[in-house]
């Protein structure tokens, strides 16, 4: 055997772990197995709440804003684009949060296969299909947020152009 740091590799290149390392890995995987759905869906739920909150806030603001009350275009632009960056960040990252859940679900499926010692096609397919739901939830958050964001960007462009047209002669 050839010794490397704290782990050793036998002649068949199989990693060997001590009992404490195996228990630690099992504990982490069991923790993920029981909680990853709650964590991922919880994060996506919080993101959805912010999308809903900022969407309602922007709709109310855009319906009440008086563009003539602003002294310059920079002040108007700052007011009109408030919270749009948050919507952009959410629609950009929600699919990645979902993908993280899917990758973790696939890891758990492989872990379960390894612990069972055999290959059962039915359990693999069930595990993989359940893992994909996280990506679906991520897309479910991202796609409407993208549409809302683009609608607001268009609204901001129209209001800024209206401001420029009214103040061009001054």
Q: Where are the language model's segments positioned?
A:
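Residue-level marker of positions within ordered structural domains that often coincide
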Residues: 12, 57, 168
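Cytoplasmic juxtamembrane regions at transmembrane-helix boundaries
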Residues: 157-170
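Short, Lys/Arg-enriched N-terminal segments with co-localized hydrophobic residues
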Residues: 3-28
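Hydrophobic alpha-helical transmembrane segments of small proteolipidic membrane proteins, enriched
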Residues: 21-160
């Amino acid at each position: 055997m050839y010794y490397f740091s704290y782990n050793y590799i036998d002649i068949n290149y199989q990693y060997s772990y001590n009992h404490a390392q195996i228990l630690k890995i099992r504990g982490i995987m069991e923790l993920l197995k029981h909680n990853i759905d709650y964590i991922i869906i919880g994060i996506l739920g919080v993101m959805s709440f912010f999308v809903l909150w900022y969407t309602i806030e922007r709709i109310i603001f855009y319906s009440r804003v008086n563009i003539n009350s602003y002294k310059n275009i920079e002040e108007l632009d700052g007011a009109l684009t408030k919270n749009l960056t948050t919507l952009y960040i959410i629609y950009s990252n929600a699919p990645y949060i979902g993908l993280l859940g899917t990758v973790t679900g696939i890891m758990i499926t492989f872990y379960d296969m390894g612990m069972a010692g055999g290959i059962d096609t039915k359990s693999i397919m069930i595990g993989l299909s359940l893992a994909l739901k996280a990506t679906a939830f991520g897309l479910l958050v991202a796609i409407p947020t993208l549409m809302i964001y683009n609608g607001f960007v268009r609204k901001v462009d129209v209001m800024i152009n209206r401001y420029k047209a009214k103040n061009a002669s001054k």
